[in-house]
């Protein structure tokens, strides 16, 4: 199977659920290329209920903001806001750049940002604004063949650092840092060159660790990259990664970096302690090697969501599938905690809340 077919096959599966140092990957983008288009259409309350009808293709992402509000990004039906009592749905009709939502983050000014198939949307709690990223032109016949798998305009990951910078991971144009005025390009030439001799680096996950380093995952055979504010360090299989197609990264409370992969080769769950990498495989009890979501609970257990696999918990010694009244939970794409220590998880099959004793399904099928 060639790389194009592999990427496309991988993305279709998603839709159904839905050490080298360098600083030459960093480029400042001109101020005049930054444009904003404010959407003035009114925000209408579309759903008022303590449960919501599940979109046809489920959900991609979840986020808890500073007000305690939960946001859920869907596969094709916009974003859902939950205030603890009711859901409200926002779509392109309300100003979103796209109904396909991949990532959500909040900035220090209380704005909520959405990574979509058509770029960035900013919501100031009143109106949506489309923020144009000054992408380098990478148009080619190759992109037409693999769209929407590799799509430079799509924003698949978002993070905010301690300085307030917004970090943006695209599905084919590397990463960008946005300081509120200017965009700076990073890692556009990492990974494997494609048929058109361009890299089209796809970054599905970005985090900041406890030391303030920014970590980037690459799904186009670029491994992981760590940026300390001055230089990038790239980690590949030769450095200890179990695979170079990385799906998600997570920093736990102790500062360890946990890495989930696309499930190729002998990949599994890899942890970096600052000195070396260690990988847990299915032979070690790992429930599934296609890790899509990682979350640490208040008891330091790791919750692991997997594509084509069941929700799993790692207590530091053993892995076990999570179940409730005999029910397991498959294809979990996001996991997060709320202000009351409930754990929320979801994906193609809906959204659930676990209060420590009982699992409550927050979506209905009709």
Each model region followed by its residue ranges:
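Carboxylate-rich, polar loop motifs that coordinate divalent cations or form catalytic acidic clusters
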Residues: 2-366
């Amino acid at each position: 199977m060639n790389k194009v077919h592999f990427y496309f096959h991988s993305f279709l599966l998603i839709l159904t659920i839905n050490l080298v140092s360098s600083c030459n990957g960093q480029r400042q983008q001109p101020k005049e290329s930054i444009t904003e288009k404010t959407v003035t259409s009114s925000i209408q309350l579309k759903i008022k209920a303590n449960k919501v009808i599940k979109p046809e293709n489920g959900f991609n992402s979840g986020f808890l903001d500073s007000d305690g509000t939960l946001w859920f990004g869907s596969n094709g039906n916009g974003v859902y806001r939950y205030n603890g009592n009711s859901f409200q749905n926002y779509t392109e009709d309300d100003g979103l750049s796209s109904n396909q939502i991949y990532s959500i983050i909040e900035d220090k000014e209380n704005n909520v940002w959405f990574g979509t198939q058509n770029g960035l949307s900013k919501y100031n709690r009143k109106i949506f604004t489309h923020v144009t990223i000054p992408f380098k032109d990478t148009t080619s016949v190759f992109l037409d063949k693999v769209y929407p798998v590799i799509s430079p305009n799509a924003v698949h990951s978002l993070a905010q650092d301690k300085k307030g910078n917004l970090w943006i991971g695209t599905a084919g144009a590397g990463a960008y840092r946005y300081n509120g005025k200017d965009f700076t390009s990073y890692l556009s030439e990492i990974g494997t060159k494609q048929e058109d001799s361009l890299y089209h680096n796809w970054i599905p996950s970005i985090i900041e660790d406890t030391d303030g380093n920014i970590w980037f995952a690459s799904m186009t055979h670029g491994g992981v990259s760590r940026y300390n504010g001055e230089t990038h360090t790239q980690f590949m299989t030769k450095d200890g990664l179990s695979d170079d197609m990385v799906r998600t990264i997570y920093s736990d409370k102790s500062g360890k970096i946990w890495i989930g992969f696309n499930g190729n080769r002998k990949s599994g769950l890899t942890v970096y302690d600052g000195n070396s990498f260690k990988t847990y495989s299915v032979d070690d009890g790992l429930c599934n090697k296609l890790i899509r979501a990682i979350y640490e609970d208040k008891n330091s257990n790791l919750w692991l969501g997997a594509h084509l696999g069941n929700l799993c918990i790692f207590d530091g010694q053993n892995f076990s599938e999570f179940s409730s009244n005999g029910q397991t939970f498959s294809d979990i794409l996001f996991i997060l905690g709320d202000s009351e220590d409930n754990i929320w998880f979801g994906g193609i099959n809906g959204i659930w809340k676990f209060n420590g004793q009982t699992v409550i399904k927050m979506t209905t099928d009709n």
